[in-house]
Design a protein with these regions (language model features):
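Catalytic core of DAGKc-family lipid kinases
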Residues: 120, 124-254
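Short glycine-rich anion-binding loops that position phosphate/pyrophosphate groups of nucleotides
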Residues: 35, 107-110, 136-139, 191, ...
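Short glycine-/acidic-enriched loop or helix-start segments at secondary-structure transitions
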Residues: 113-115, 143-144, 266-267
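Glycine-rich phosphate/pyrophosphate-binding beta-alpha loops
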Residues: 190, 194, 254-268, 331
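ATP/NTP phosphate-donor binding region
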Residues: 1-105, 112-123
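ATP/nucleoside-binding phosphotransfer catalytic cores, i.e., glycine-rich phosphate-binding loops
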Residues: 2-21, 40, 244, 265-355
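A residue-level signal for conserved active-site and pocket-lining positions in enzyme catalytic cores
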Residues: 81, 197, 255, 278, ...
Length: 355
């Protein structure tokens, strides 16, 4: 890993970027040096080749006006990415003529910290900012693309700013989870088996070599209902006008809602393979679980009889047993007192670059 090469390459690309043309650009790279894209040799070599290629491609664009030289800041632990972003938000409030580009150079955890800070920023400040999420983690489900080249294309080609919603989990007032912080996801928020896999993977981090997520997917497919009772959930789906789309009562292994369709989680597991943003998976025998598990990886599960897939703005659900929820890798245990709970798209708030 050569951080000097990394920052110099991005600085040179930003110097010729087409983001916010006609305005001074302030570019800050927030780097998590512990991210897999830096520490895993094969990934770093691939990123080095791509950065070299795009450093050369950027030269075809004219040099742009920068407010100052590109700044790079290393994170130093959990929450650091959010703290750095909040400092940039404070600075941006004082300099409305400048466009602030935050490049998140880390994994999905770093991306989430940055976007959480942006979510809470004043709207007039967010309108002068954008975040670019490089695929420098191991899974990269929350990056702008799993391909480094496709993300860097957003710097050297004409782009516009598009505001993306988040997904918020709300729980019953007075329940055990209601006093916690805001529950937000910027990719997929899920309840049930996947949240259990995420919870166990988090517990194993640093203790087991290799991809423990895939290990726990295999374990959960066989034994999840030994850990948590899979019982009926009452589910109600609503559109953005609060009109009911569908309601049902099923024993569910999984309930997942994405910011949009065409989204992956768990290291590119293709749970939302088309335009629809909600996927529910019913309880089923073990042999069916094993069959569907392999189909989810390739996004071929949508026509299975155990799968309910739809578009919704809000999903309300209630049950009578504890169940885990996960928000982009962070988990919370929902108790019966937390129901009814809901997953809902927020207003569009996260400024992203789009071609």
């Amino acid at each position: 890993m050569d951080l000097d090469f990394f920052t110099q390459s991005l600085a040179e690309i930003c110097d010729h970027s087409l983001v916010a043309p006609g305005r001074p650009l302030d570019c800050t790279i927030i780097i998590n040096p512990a991210a897999g894209g830096f520490t895993i040799g094969s990934k770093w070599k691939s990123h080095t080749r791509t950065l070299t290629e795009y450093r050369q491609k950027a030269q075809a664009n004219p040099q742009r006006t920068m407010s100052e030289s590109v700044n790079s800041i290393l994170t130093d632990g959990r929450g650091s990415g959010g703290n750095i972003t909040r400092a940039l938000i404070d600075e941006a409030q004082k300099k409305p003529d400048i466009f602030y580009l935050i490049i998140s150079a880390g994994g999905d955890g770093t991306h989430c910290e940055i976007m959480y800070a942006l979510y809470n920023a004043p709207a007039h400040v967010r309108s002068n900012m954008a975040v670019l999420r490089l695929p420098l983690g191991t899974g990269n489900d929350g990056a702008d693309s799993a391909s480094m080249a496709k993300v860097l294309d957003l710097l050297i080609n004409p782009v516009h700013i598009e505001f993306s919603p988040a997904i918020q989990l709300t729980t019953a007032y007075g329940g055990p989870a209601s006093g916690n912080d805001l529950f937000l996801a910027f990719n997929i928020l899920s309840v049930g088996l996947d949240a259990f896999v995420t919870h166990m993977t988090n517990k194993m981090k640093g203790k087991v070599a290799g991809d423990s997520y895939k290990l726990w997917v295999d374990i959960a497919a066989l034994f999840y209902d030994r850990f948590y009772k899979v019982d009926f959930l009452d589910v109600r789906a609503l559109d953005d006008k609060n009109q009911e789309i569908l309601s049902f009562r099923e024993k569910l292994l999984l309930l997942a809602m994405g910011v949009s369709g065409h989204r992956t989680y768990g290291s590119q597991q293709n749970i939302l393979p088309d335009d629809r943003n909600v996927c529910c998976v019913k309880q089923m025998p073990i042999h069916r679980k094993l069959a569907i598990k392999s189909q989810v990886t390739k996004g071929r599960h949508t026509n299975n009889r155990e799968v309910i897939i739809l578009n919704a703005h809000r999903i309300e659900f209630s049950g009578s047993h504890p169940i885990l929820a996960q928000m982009d890798g962070e988990t919370v245990l929902l108790q019966p007192e937390d129901f009814p709970s809901a997953l809902e798209l927020t207003a569009p708030v996260i400024p992203l670059l789009k071609m």
